[in-house]
Amino acid sequence: MRIPNVFLSYLRQVAVDGTLSSCSGVKSRKPVIAYGFDDSQDSLVDENDEKILEPFGYYRHLLKGKSARTVLMHCFNAFLGLPEDWVIGVTKAIEDLHNASLLIDDIEDESALRRGSPAAHMKYGIALTMNAGNLVYFTVLQDVYDLGMKTGGTQVANAMARIYTEEMIELHRGQGIEIWWRDQRSPPSVDQYIHMLEQKTGGLLRLGVRLLQCHPGVNNRADLSDIALRIGVYYQLRDDYINLMSTSYHDERGFAEDMTEGKYTFPMLHSLKRSPDSGLREILDLKPADIALKKKAIAIMQDTGSLVATRNLLGAVKNDLSGLVAEQRGDDYAMSAGLERFLEKLYIAE
């Protein structure tokens, strides 16, 4: 996939004159026309950004702390040996992109809560929240391009912008088809569902790895993308499971909230395939908020062996990950020690 030359020219010009900005550190365009009513135009731009990015700032504060994505990027760098400032730059881009995507996801999923607090659109409204999320998508692209220009010039910057665009397209394809399945009440096959997870959930981590490996001084061309992809898939399958089974998850998102949102998850799809006439589909189509009805649906999934099947699939992905990590590290166990510690904390106990 290629970014149009006219867009790349625009990006190059922006990198030179610094005419954009955001919370991500990119400079905002100053007003072109000034009529003398107010000479504090720099503060005007800053004030506007602060206002329009309030939903994003709210999530960044709500989700603060050393995230799994930050830890993972540093674990991957143990294989690559890249400068710390480069890893920090890529990690910040991934974190900002993740938080921005949550703003949009929570609107599209009609989620009322995020980490036990009101979702951003419940607090700031749909329009401002959506605009903030979309704005950060573009400011992150600018940050990625600037990082590439600063480190390796136009060739590296263009490669990073291309990779960012490719993965963002895949992410939106995954999110889009999940919404289509939900709104059309058309459950996908299990294979289709896993492919969607690769696009949507695995893609963000794969983006981070691909951006890291754009550094002009990278020597180790380890194929870490497959590892990143499977970690993302494992994360979502794990969420599918704990959404139905974990009381702490219920406290933060609501009991079996995936059902209320109308989502199809792996345990649901497995159960529908095993027993099409169990009554589960009729319950799911109601997008139930009633706890008793949700418990009935979970009981059906237990009867069809779907919760056990979910754990078995998680075990299979875990085995795949172990094999891929061993393949990339060779005999250098120290190289993969951080990643393996991370994975052990991620895995559901067998």
From Swiss-Prot:
Gene Ontology biological process: antibiotic biosynthetic process; terpenoid biosynthetic process
Needed co-factor(s): Mg(2+)
GO MF annotation list: (2E,6E)-farnesyl diphosphate synthase activity; dimethylallyltranstransferase activity; geranylgeranyl diphosphate synthase activity; metal ion binding
Cofactor binding: number and manner: Binds 2 Mg(2+) ions per subunit.
PROSITE patterns: POLYPRENYL_SYNTHASE_1, POLYPRENYL_SYNTHASE_2
Keyword Magnesium: yes
Residues where Mg(2+) 1 binds: D105, D109
Superkingdom of origin: Eukaryota
Residues involved in isopentenyl diphosphate binding: K66, R69, H98, R115
Pathway: Secondary metabolite biosynthesis; terpenoid biosynthesis
Residues the record lists as binding dimethylallyl diphosphate: R114, K200, T201, Q236, N243, K263
UniProt site positions, description: Important for determining product chain length: Y137
UniProt KW keywords: Antibiotic biosynthesis, Isoprene biosynthesis, Magnesium, Metal-binding, Transferase
Role this protein plays: Geranylgeranyl pyrophosphate synthase; part of the gene cluster that mediates the biosynthesis of pleuromutilin, a tricyclic diterpene showing antibacterial properties. The geranylgeranyl diphosphate (GGPP) synthase catalyzes the first step in pleuromutilin biosynthesis. GGPP is then substrate of the premutilin synthase (PS) to yield premutilin. Premutilin synthase is a bifunctional enzyme composed of the fusion of a class II diterpene cyclase (DTC) and a class I diterpene synthase (DTS), with the corresponding domains and active sites containing characteristic aspartate-rich motifs.
UniProt similarity note: Belongs to the FPP/GGPP synthase family.
Name assigned to this protein: Geranylgeranyl pyrophosphate synthase
